[in-house]
Amino acid sequence: SLDAISNGRLELGVGLGWQQEEYEASGIAFENRTKIFWETLAICQSLWEGGPISHQGEMFTFNNIWCQPTPAQGRDLPLLFGVKMTESNAQKIAKVGHGWIPIKTSREFISEGKIILDQAFKDEGRTDSPRIRGQLPTCLDSNGIPSVDLTLKELEKSMDAGLEEIEVFPINFAQSPEHLREVLESIAEIKK
């Protein structure tokens, strides 16, 4: 397990996917994806506690299965969900997860989702706050090229909307290998 090798530093981002063709290529009925996802996640969390485990569910049935080595964090491996925030998804995340990775970068989308997820955490009796990790909206310069500097200017607004952890992918901005260093230096400045 990657979590065991990294001494408990793994954080797992999970989601259902939206492309029906991907499911069809795998021989999985698209309409069953939600059931499969949540049942699979429950199975994984049980396996992470140690085994063997047996499971008789709607989608899967098995007996005496092991997962070794178990994650250093056990069942509490941080789970961040890349889903559209709905009350149903928020309730499920509040039961088993740690946070949300918004699938859109708009501040309105993030803010509305945060309100729903915060309420679900309260309803579940949790005292911790959900983690919200996402990207800034990519801003283009006057030539239509993605600009790291303009994008980073959106940081405060996105954090005000509810993002607490920001992911910046240099590949979105570096126009050449030579440009990569400049992009990385701009990103490094936000830590100061």
Name each region found by the language model.
Residues S1-K192:
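Active-site-adjacent structural elements that line small-molecule/cofactor binding pockets in enzymes
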